[in-house]
From Swiss-Prot:
Gene from which the chain derives: RPS42
Subunit-structure text: Component of the small ribosomal subunit. Mature ribosomes consist of a small (40S) and a large (60S) subunit. The 40S subunit contains about 32 different proteins and 1 molecule of RNA (18S). The 60S subunit contains 45 different proteins and 3 molecules of RNA (25S, 5.8S and 5S).
Official protein name in the record: Small ribosomal subunit protein eS4
Statement: the UniProt record of this protein carries the keyword Ribonucleoprotein: yes
Highest classification ranks of the organism: Eukaryota, Fungi, Dikarya, Ascomycota, Saccharomycotina
Family: Belongs to the eukaryotic ribosomal protein eS4 family.
Amino acid sequence: MARGPKKHLKRLAAPSHWMLDKLSGTYAPRPSAGPHKLRESLPLVVFLRNRLKYALNGREVKAIMMQQHVQVDGKVRTDTTYPAGFMDVITLEATNEHFRLVYDVKGKFAVHRISAEEAAYKLGKVKKVQLGKKGVPYVVTHDGRTIRYPDPLIRANDTVKIDLATGKIDDFIKFDTGRLVMVTGGRNLGRVGVIVHREKHEGGFDLVHIKDALENTFVTRLSNVFVIGTEAGKPWVSLPKGKGIKLSISEERDRRRAQQGL
């Protein structure tokens, strides 16, 4: 009989996008409870040890974090299994480096370095808009933030630009055709394109038709779409290598051969 939350995570059951090898142990770091879901997050220990190679093991990661060198969205974090997720800004003060967690077209979190100016803000997808106690309006974003007194024009599925120093909304983008979006779930995870058409299905899932920079069109659920810019070629955040354009296997092969001069 289960009593309370699980405290362990087997390595084979861990999300594949963490890219942990099977033979390095039985267990994987289980993310703490936090702003992102377990399968949509990346524990800081995996980011520092496996991706950046700044530590050899978990003990070294703990030593780095207990010296308050690591910040997520402008706040010092000392929990090695803190779940960082999509659009989070990770700052390493000792090396003066800033990273934003965004997906590449392979569906994995890219190690994407950003400037100090870009690290001052993040984008958040509005999940719901409601009235609280005493009629105070508020919005809830994809990373669990509750922001009171938003602009009355903001609706669900819009994207807000959040100042990390104050936690307030600086600007927002309406969800509409012609907007630049990134896909955050499903088989098209990490692809970037422009909204062409929205299909409404009563009692089902709304679908969004998206066209990428190579004029390829694909369809995904509305819940997987995250607006990142007002129009094509003008994202509000910098994109990782590949710019969210997914190539076929043959196209990848041809590009690789061209780089090798074959």
